Curated annotation (Swiss-Prot):
Gene3D superfamilies (UniProt xref): CD59, Phosphorylase Kinase, domain 1, Transferase(Phosphotransferase) domain 1
Active site: D322
Enzyme class (EC, first level): transferase
UniProt: ATP binding residues: K198, A199, R200, G201, R202, F203, G204, C205, V206, K219
Species of the source: Bos taurus (Bovine)
Glycan-bearing residues: N43, N66
One GO location term (cellular component): plasma membrane
Positions in coiled-coil regions: none
Protein's name in the database: Activin receptor type-2A
Length: 513
């Protein structure tokens, strides 16, 4: 019996360790296809590069329909870290489906071929006459059965542990307050009604919705943009992310079937919309400009700040990487809040910032070093890239301000006058990098004391030398000082203004990055 027990235990150890011994093929690229490419605003076919956290697996997937023997592909592409796809080199569906078939696999382009092989039902053999067993057979049987049961329980427990640890949760629900209070009820248990589409972007569309008796914004991502949705959720879930000048996060959910899944991100809703939309329809006074610019700068400064010792943990420094007027929302009192963290990077001590692809963001807001592909992949370099883009947003505000004694321009995006509405990467490289041009600062802006100071601040934000740029905190302090200074100036003091402007002590230019 001792030899039998040793044999069973050895078999059990081999079966448990075989998965760790076997290597797995890394998935870098998958065949891409989207039957609903027009609705989702994607390419129809092609090859998709798979990105994700280094400690997560990447897979390929395919979904299709079988209509009277005719195969109709629904979607193909990248799939992120699903335990059901582990160590599958072929894309094979084994379960029958009346609607859509789904398979996933590991390995480059492994979803190019897919198939359906139903699991064969094991038929029970017909009973045969019982032949007498020797006595030692019963001894061995009674010895092995308890050992095999124990081994089975251990294997099942290990599988459940891995499944819950590594598989992505079907519903992510944050707490309303990241501190000690218990989590809020599941959003899925509250009636959430989509009302109207308010905006469409690179990663999906934004709906105005009603949650109980309040309006909320619901950003809906298609499944192929899971990485962006997951990144936004992770950034919003960091300690200390509740701030007046950062968009309020409410929750995140998966909606739909296992195949046709939409990813929802629920945030506060602001009727005035983005700064870009507001400036298209409105001009701003000097005080309104200062309020919008100051609150925007304070939001970005808080995002950039590394704050240890909060009650719910350590808030790391975060680079937004897509600062633009479309991603600055306005509350009813024109207070600005930063939104859209799909491309954001967090810088946690002792941890990698993740996959840092250099040329990301919106072309017309890309800093010279981004356009050149000459980024220093350090925290401060990414924060300075945000500051270049902020300089362009401040220019948009200045172009629609009524403070200066001159005409107010029609709203235009940065570089729209120089390049047009749809610049290519090559266009931006030529204008920004080689010619070192920036949007025009009108001469008559300089005749207003506050606008003259603002123009100087803008130029120091979009400086070609990244290390010479201001920090967000410094910009916020400067705008506060500008508003305070101009508010005490009267028309009779116009002669004094020139002296005051030239002698004003700005906050130090050194970046606090």
């Amino acid at each position: 019996m001792g030899a039998a027990a040793k044999l069973a235990f050895a078999v059990f150890l081999i079966s448990c360790s075989s998965g760790a011994i076997l290597g797995r093929s890394e998935t870098q690229e998958c065949i891409f296809y989207n039957a609903n490419w027009e609705r989702d605003r994607t390419n129809r076919t092609g090859v998709e590069s798979c990105y994700g956290d280094k400690d997560k697996r990447r897979h390929c997937f395919a979904t299709w329909k079988n209509i009277s023997g005719s195969i109709e592909i629904v979607k193909q592409g990248c799939w992120l870290d699903d335990i059901n796809c582990y160590d599958r080199t072929d894309c094979i569906e084994k379960k029958d489906s009346p609607e859509v078939y789904f398979c996933c696999c590991e390995g480059n382009m492994c979803n190019e071929r897919f198939s359906y092989f139903p699991e064969m039902e094991v038929t029970q053999p017909t009973s045969n006459p019982v032949t007498p067993k020797p006595p030692y057979y019963n001894i061995l049987l009674y010895s092995l059965v308890p050992l095999m049961l124990i081994a089975g329980i251990v294997i099942c427990a290990f599988w459940v542990y891995r499944h819950h640890k590594m598989a992505y949760p079907p519903v992510l629900v944050p707490t309303q307050d990241p501190g000690p209070p218990p989590p809020s009820p599941l959003l899925g248990l509250k009636p959430l009604q989509l009302l109207e589409v308010k905006a469409r972007g690179r990663f999906g569309c934004v709906w105005k919705a009603q949650l109980l008796n309040e309006y909320v914004a619901v950003k809906i991502f298609p499944i192929q943009d899971k990485q962006s949705w997951q990144n936004e959720y992770e950034v919003y879930s960091l300690p200390g992310m509740k701030h007046e000048n950062i968009l309020q996060f409410i929750g995140a959910e998966k909606r739909g079937t296992s195949v046709d899944v939409d990813l929802w991100l629920i945030t506060a809703f602001h009727e005035k919309g983005s700064l870009s939309d507001f400036l298209k329809a409105n001009v701003v006074s000097w005080n309104e400009l200062c309020h919008i610019a100051e609150t925007m700068a304070r939001g970005l400064a808080y995002l950039h700040e590394d704050i240890p010792g909060l009650k719910d943990g350590h808030k790391p420094a975060i680079s937004h990487r897509d600062i633009k007027s479309k991603n600055v929302l306005l509350k009813n009192n024109l207070t600005a809040c930063i939104a859209d963290f799909g491309l954001a990077l967090k810088f946690e001590a002792g941890k990698s910032a993740g996959d840092t692809h250099g040329q990301v963001g919106t072309r017309r807001y890309m800093a010279p070093e981004v356009l050149e592909g000459a980024i220093n992949f350090q925290r401060d370099a990414f924060l300075r890239i945000d500051m270049y883009a902020m300089g362009l947003v401040l220019w948009e505000l200045a172009s629609r301000c009524t403070a200066a004694d001159g005409p107010v321009d029609e709203y235009m995006l940065p570089f729209e006058e120089e390049i047009g509405q749809h610049p290519s990467l090559e266009d931006m490289q030529e204008v920004v990098v080689h010619k070192k041009k920036r949007p025009v600062l009108r001469d008559y802006w300089q005749k207003h004391a506050g606008m003259a100071m603002l123009c100087e601040t803008i130029e120091e934000c979009w400086d070609h030398d990244a290390e010479a740029r201001l920090s967000a905190g410094c910009v916020g302090e400067r705008i506060t000082q500008m508003q305070r200074l101009t508010n005490i100036i009267t028309t009779e003091d116009i002669v004094t203004v020139v002296t005051m402007v030239t002698n004003v002590d700005f906050p130090p230019k050194e970046s606090s990055l």
